[in-house]
Amino acid sequence: MFEHVHDVPPPGAAPDWTIPQDWDAFSADEHAMWDRLFARQCAMLPGRAASAFLRGIDVLKLGRPGIPDYRELNATLMAATGWQVVAVPGLVPDDVFFDHLANRRFPAGNFIRRPDQLDYLKEPDVFHDVFGHVPMLADPVFADYMVAYGKGGLRSLGFGALHKLARLYWYTVEFGLIEEAGALRIYGAGIVSSYGESVFALDDPSPNRIGFDLLRMMRTEYRIDDFQQNYFVIPSLEHLLNVTVETDFGPLYDRLDTLSDVAIAEILPEDRVITRGTQQYARLKAGA
């Protein structure tokens, strides 16, 4: 999904790559950046974000000013679902990441974007990781899904199938949509933490919106440099968890090896198409 920078824990990091959050070291400007991003997203997410995400914001009291102090955040999160947030210096190796998830620890980058990075940065920061991901971890069903994904990720390394499983994470945890009360809502962290994509994912005619299918999703390429051209829609968090837990991924990886990848924006005859996108946004960007 992303490229990590270091192959061994950098100075000051533990063997599992965790570091102290050192909350007191964040500057007033850094706290102000969190508040600016938080206010901007929360003003437009009601009616767009999944109910589980909005509940998580309230349960975890993320509306308090400033970057959350993990000592306080984790006390509430642990009581809700047994999860905790751990600070890391940046992107960590895949096996380390999966081990954290499998043990109900979510690694969060310990820095926040600069003003000139307000709408885009290559590496996820504390706002993306905590605002985008952690509210969903307060939901028991999604919390269990993330544990299952972490355990599955560790197993995938033995199959040489990491790039296939990464697509599941990308199209659910990062850029997933959910059907709620007859409408589409956002639950993916890459969307809820992005002002532009929170609108684009639901309102723009450009992207495809396709019903969730595990095999299809794990065949589908994705892009990391702009708004998505496909969004996959789950019917419920319970469905996502059940499919993940009940699937034997070994035979699935074998089957994936016999199938070609699906190009970005391609629609298959068997797809449950909710919205067939025009792909106009991607074409305009490609021609720019």
Residue map of PLM features:
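The feature captures two recurrent sequence modes
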Residues: 1-137, 217, 229-288
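A contiguous, surface-oriented mixed alpha/beta subdomain in the mid-to-C-terminal portion of proteins
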Residues: 116-120, 124-242
